[in-house]
Amino acid sequence: MTIAVCPGSYDPVTAGHLDVIERSARFFDEVHVVVAVNAAKTPMFSEATRVDVIRRALDKAGCKNVTVSSTDGLITDYCKKVGATVIIKGLRQNGDYEAELGMALVNRKLAGIETLFLPADPILEHISSSIVKDVARHGGDVTGMVPDCVVPMLADALAEERQRKD
């Protein structure tokens, strides 16, 4: 059985993330989507919320061989714990490769875990969590960029953010 891990901050999960996860689920017996907690980042959504939203989106997509969880440790440690031999990362044309290559080499050196890069769907490659939040902050419509359940959550989170600033 081949087990893969798709790590990310998923703040929020986007249509591009889901595309990579769904495509990965076709190639591997088991895929673990891992919300990686990064102490250097201040997320908009809680760890539990991000896990829940991804689960709901993947249930709707019918992905039966995908597990969603989180970790605040090294992804390689998580991989060892679940027996994963591959880390999956989606790549856009915006410099993702350069950013991800160094991490892939470290992961292979630390734990012998390979990284498989999947190119983003050209229709989705412009979408990132940062862009989604920026568009929403400025009143733009993010429908289609994120799962349907994220749209109202994003509006609520931004309303709370504005109230804190006032």
Swiss-Prot record:
<keyword id="KW-0067">ATP-binding</keyword>
<feature type="binding site">
    <location>
        <begin position="124"/>
        <end position="130"/>
    </location>
    <ligand>
        <name>ATP</name>
    </ligand>
</feature>
<feature type="binding site">
    <location>
        <position position="17"/>
    </location>
    <ligand>
        <name>ATP</name>
    </ligand>
</feature>
<keyword id="KW-0548">Nucleotidyltransferase</keyword>
<keyword id="KW-0173">Coenzyme A biosynthesis</keyword>
<dbReference type="GO" id="GO:0005524">
    <property type="term" value="F:ATP binding"/>
</dbReference>
<feature type="binding site">
    <location>
        <position position="89"/>
    </location>
    <ligand>
        <name>substrate</name>
    </ligand>
</feature>
<feature type="site" description="Transition state stabilizer">
    <location>
        <position position="17"/>
    </location>
</feature>
<dbReference type="InterPro" id="IPR004821">
    <property type="entry name" value="Cyt_trans-like"/>
</dbReference>
<dbReference type="GO" id="GO:0004595">
    <property type="term" value="F:pantetheine-phosphate adenylyltransferase activity"/>
</dbReference>
<keyword id="KW-0460">Magnesium</keyword>
<keyword id="KW-0547">Nucleotide-binding</keyword>
<protein>
    <recommendedName>
        <fullName>Phosphopantetheine adenylyltransferase</fullName>
        <ecNumber>2.7.7.3</ecNumber>
    </recommendedName>
</protein>
<dbReference type="InterPro" id="IPR014729">
    <property type="entry name" value="Rossmann-like_a/b/a_fold"/>
</dbReference>
<feature type="binding site">
    <location>
        <position position="41"/>
    </location>
    <ligand>
        <name>substrate</name>
    </ligand>
</feature>
<keyword id="KW-0808">Transferase</keyword>
<dbReference type="GO" id="GO:0005737">
    <property type="term" value="C:cytoplasm"/>
</dbReference>
<dbReference type="InterPro" id="IPR001980">
    <property type="entry name" value="PPAT"/>
</dbReference>
<comment type="pathway">
    <text>Cofactor biosynthesis; coenzyme A biosynthesis; CoA from (R)-pantothenate: step 4/5.</text>
</comment>
<keyword id="KW-0963">Cytoplasm</keyword>
<feature type="binding site">
    <location>
        <begin position="90"/>
        <end position="92"/>
    </location>
    <ligand>
        <name>ATP</name>
    </ligand>
</feature>
<feature type="binding site">
    <location>
        <position position="9"/>
    </location>
    <ligand>
        <name>substrate</name>
    </ligand>
</feature>
<dbReference type="GO" id="GO:0015937">
    <property type="term" value="P:coenzyme A biosynthetic process"/>
</dbReference>
<feature type="binding site">
    <location>
        <position position="75"/>
    </location>
    <ligand>
        <name>substrate</name>
    </ligand>
</feature>
<comment type="similarity">
    <text>Belongs to the bacterial CoaD family.</text>
</comment>
<comment type="subunit">
    <text>Homohexamer.</text>
</comment>
<feature type="binding site">
    <location>
        <begin position="9"/>
        <end position="10"/>
    </location>
    <ligand>
        <name>ATP</name>
    </ligand>
</feature>
<feature type="binding site">
    <location>
        <position position="100"/>
    </location>
    <ligand>
        <name>ATP</name>
    </ligand>
</feature>
<comment type="function">
    <text>Reversibly transfers an adenylyl group from ATP to 4'-phosphopantetheine, yielding dephospho-CoA (dPCoA) and pyrophosphate.</text>
</comment>
<dbReference type="Pfam" id="PF01467">
    <property type="entry name" value="CTP_transf_like"/>
</dbReference>
